[in-house]
Amino acid sequence: PLLQCVILRSKVLMKAKHLFEFLGILLVALLLGVGSAVWVLDSFTRTKIIRDRAWTSSPLVGSVHADMYLRAFVARTALFALSKTEALYYNAFTDEDGEPLRAECDYIVDGGDVPARWWSITAYDEDHFLIPNRLNRYSYHMKNLRRDEKGRYRIHLSQIPKDHNWLPSPRQGNMSLTLRAYNPAPALAENIGAAELPTIMKTGCK
């Protein structure tokens, strides 16, 4: 009986060891799979079809011709994309120098109108959620921006409040901007890289 108990215990321990090994391999495989998927999507944002300094876009967003990577990117960033004749989407994850947009840094977004019936600029945190703030201010659009005598605007993207055109940054991490242009002019819809997009200049960091 004692020998049988020892043998049985050894078998149980061996099965448990194999089970833990299997679970360990499965966990590593899952982590590698998720990590590689995120890397592919992040790489995709850096190699989009259209790139204008800090901004990236694609004429295939919202179309039946979008491949699985573009569809995954749209789902990840929650664009709820329409076709290019209805809306164009420009995303910025970096400033003019190619550096990631960081919460601890201040930026000035300087630009003019986009040829569209309506356009807006929205800030998101690194998880692509709206940034919580006491003013419930998440974006600016073409009608509520304070402009200079030439019709241009300057949005202040920072944690510290500004007197006007202030868009709050998150407390930590990276962030991004999305410019949406609804009912774009036909010429822009056919050549989305022709838009004069705003510059994103870093003015300092904490």
Protein language model annotation of sequence segments:
Residues 7-206:
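A compositional/structural signature for long, glycine/proline-rich flexible linkers
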